[in-house]
Regions:
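An anion/phosphate-binding loop that grips the pyrophosphate of nucleotide cofactors and donors
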Residues: 2
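Short, well-ordered coil/turn residues at beta-beta hairpins
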Residues: 7-8, 28
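Short, polar loop motifs at secondary-structure junctions
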Residues: 9-11, 134-135
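Glycine/serine-rich phosphate-binding loop and adjoining beta1-alpha1 elements at the start
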Residues: 13-104
Length: 136
């Protein structure tokens, strides 16, 4: 038995029964999104350390920030893909072309994910609006 398991992604269903009492597992668990995963880890009696909850003394989340940056940037790429007619979209090109206005992107939330989504959308030439409750 391994005493410690270090992963990037959360354990998949096929791995649940392999987790044993007392093992320490470091990974991005995202427990809020999977009741089944949460219950499996509770039942295993393993020590689960979720990267996304590790805090610096100032309260920042140093292990969540890089993944959030990637998520924000990927959101624009995925959204752009689904604007293509081949994907059932309306054939909108986010950056536009000469004579055609660029697409409009509304980003809800100005946290790490939202800011990176806005940067990516601006980078491809979209018209970008950001909405957030915090004016800072």
């Amino acid at each position: 038995m391994s005493e410690m398991i270090v992963k990037v992604k959360e354990p998949i269903k096929q791995e649940y029964d392999l987790v044993q009492k007392g093992q320490v597992i470091f990974t991005y668990f995202h427990f809020a999104s999977s009741e089944r995963l949460t219950q499996a880890m509770v039942d295993s009696k393993a020590v689960c350390i979720a990267y996304e909850t590790v805090e610096d003394p100032d309260g920042s989340l140093p292990l969540l920030t890089p993944m959030s940056e990637v998520a924000g940037r990927m959101a624009i790429q995925q959204g752009a893909k689904y604007l293509e007619m081949a994907q059932g979209g309306h054939g909108v090109l986010l950056g536009g072309v000469p004579g055609v206005d660029p697409g409009t992107v509304v980003v809800i939330g100005g946290g790490v994910v939202g800011v990176n989504a806005a940067k990516m959308a601006c980078g491809v030439g979209a018209k970008v609006y950001m909405m957030d409750m915090n004016l800072d």
